[in-house]
Amino acid sequence: MVESVVKNWQGEQIGQKTFELRVAKETTAAHIVHRALVRQQTNARQGTASTKTRAEVRGGGRKPWRQKGTGRARAGSIRSPLWRGGGVIFGPKPRDFDLKMNRKERRLALRTAFVSRIDDLILVEEFSNELSRPKTKDLVAAFTRWGAEPESKILLILSEFPENVYLSARNIENLKLIAADQLNVYDLLHADKIVVTTSALEKIQEVYNG
């Protein structure tokens, strides 16, 4: 059971909200979160790097000069890895880096990572109505009132993206906007401050506690 203060648009405390997310045991928490993080970063790799071996490089079928009598080092092909323009020894080939992790484990890692950031979590009431039109300056000022300085890396978690909020947020350099049902371990751990709306918190409990 975790308790957090709820703030309004002006940055004033207007109440408390209690939520419960099942997390990993203390002895295994770091391990499972680390596994989820490694999986996410590894699966993001394209795996498309490719080089040609001496067998795949065009040309080089003819021996460039005779074996003996020239005074030069012997050579069998102009596509030897020792030659400029030759094949690559043990170079990269396209491969699949995907790591598998059970869905239950992934969700457990997400919940554990989220709860581990409780000290940096800022819970706010819905504020889309406070922005009558897209205004980045107003949103930056709100973050400052909530205790999240614009210079720090901020993760803003919303249940949905109202147009005024999205347009106001997209030009803030260190801000990342994410939907409550699209959480990932890297963003949760990478942010300095995590700002969550009350409806987004309810969505997180609904989606990830199952």
Curated annotation (Swiss-Prot):
Residues 41-71 are annotated as: Disordered. Residues 60-71 have a biased composition (Basic residues). Keywords: Ribonucleoprotein, Ribosomal protein, RNA-binding, rRNA-binding. One of its GO terms (cellular component) is ribosome. The keyword Hydrolase does not apply. GO terms for biological process: translation. Disulfide bonds: none annotated. Pfam families: Ribosomal_L4. InterPro entries: Ribosomal_uL4, Ribosomal_uL4-like, Ribosomal_uL4_dom_sf. Belongs to the universal ribosomal protein uL4 family. One of the primary rRNA binding proteins, this protein initially binds near the 5'-end of the 23S rRNA. It is important during the early stages of 50S assembly. It makes multiple contacts with different domains of the 23S rRNA in the assembled 50S subunit and ribosome. Part of the 50S ribosomal subunit. HAMAP family: Ribosomal_uL4_B. This is Large ribosomal subunit protein uL4. It comes from Nostoc sp. (strain PCC 7120 / SAG 25.82 / UTEX 2576).
